[in-house]
């Protein structure tokens, strides 16, 4: 019974770490990556559609993203969606493709991004800790229902080890992303 709770908690913790990883991938660090456009949705014939389902996104150079919509009539909508999004890059179009030139990050912007990263990481840590708390509460409830005390204690210890493992993983991701951003 306790093992099921712990495996469920581990699955949830993995998902929390994955969310943080995706959040980090969507932050631009001075290099062009298609993942910075993952959250951009375009109004395609009245339906909000993810940009990566409407166009081919490629990186021909280190600081340039090229968006090639399969339907050329959607180019103005794609431009509007990029401008509305929090990407912070102005698109330039030549009628067939849209180019996004990623500007060099200023030191001020770098420190701002590091703050954002730390905030998102803290949200991830809190999520992992909340999962631990909820699972601990479940273990304590099961203990009242008749699970032996030593089994409950082992479960709580194992849960704490999992929590430490995933919090450490988030911390390592923060360190790596921070180095990537602060690189000039």
Swiss-Prot record:
State the Pfam families in the record.
RRF
User: What InterPro entries does the record point to?
Assistant: Ribosome_recyc_fac (IPR002661), Ribosome_recyc_fac_dom (IPR023584), RRF_sf (IPR036191)
Q: Does the keyword Cytoplasm apply?
A: yes
> What is one GO biological process annotated to this record?
translational termination
Its chief place of residence is cytoplasm
Q: Does the keyword Cytoplasm apply?
A: yes
Identify the domain of life. Bacteria
Its keywords, alphabetically, are: Cytoplasm, Protein biosynthesis
Q: Which GO terms describe its molecular function?
A: ribosomal large subunit binding
Q: Which GO terms describe its cellular component?
A: cytoplasm
Q: Where in the cell is it found?
A: Cytoplasm
Give me the ranges of the annotated region Disordered: 137-158
Give the PANTHER family listed for this entry.
MITOCHONDRIAL RIBOSOME RECYCLING FACTOR PSEUDO 1, RIBOSOME RECYCLING FACTOR
Q: What does this protein do?
A: Responsible for the release of ribosomes from messenger RNA at the termination of protein biosynthesis. May increase the efficiency of translation by recycling ribosomes from one round of translation to another.
Q: Which family does it belong to?
A: Belongs to the RRF family.
UniProt name for this protein? Ribosome-recycling factor
Source organism of this protein record: Desulforamulus reducens (strain ATCC BAA-1160 / DSM 100696 / MI-1) (Desulfotomaculum reducens)
């Amino acid at each position: 019974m306790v093992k099921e709770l712990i495996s469920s908690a581990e699955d949830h913790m993995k998902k929390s770490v994955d969310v943080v990883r995706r959040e980090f991938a969507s932050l631009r660090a001075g290099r062009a990556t298609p993942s910075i456009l993952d959250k951009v949705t375009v109004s395609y014939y009245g339906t909000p559609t993810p940009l990566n389902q409407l166009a081919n996104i490629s990186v021909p150079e280190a600081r340039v993203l090229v968006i090639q919509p399969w339907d050329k009539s959607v180019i103005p909508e794609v431009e509007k969606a990029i401008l509305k999004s929090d990407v912070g890059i102005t698109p330039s179009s030549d009628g067939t493709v849209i180019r996004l030139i990623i500007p060099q990050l200023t030191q001020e912007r770098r420190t701002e991004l590091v703050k954002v990263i730390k905030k998102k990481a803290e949200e991830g840590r809190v999520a992992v800790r909340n999962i631990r708390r909820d699972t601990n509460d479940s273990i304590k409830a099961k203990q009242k229902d008749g699970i032996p005390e030593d089994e409950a204690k082992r479960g709580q210890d194992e849960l704490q080890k999992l929590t430490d493992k995933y919090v450490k993983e988030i911390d390592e991701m923060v360190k790596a992303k921070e180095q990537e951003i602060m690189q000039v």
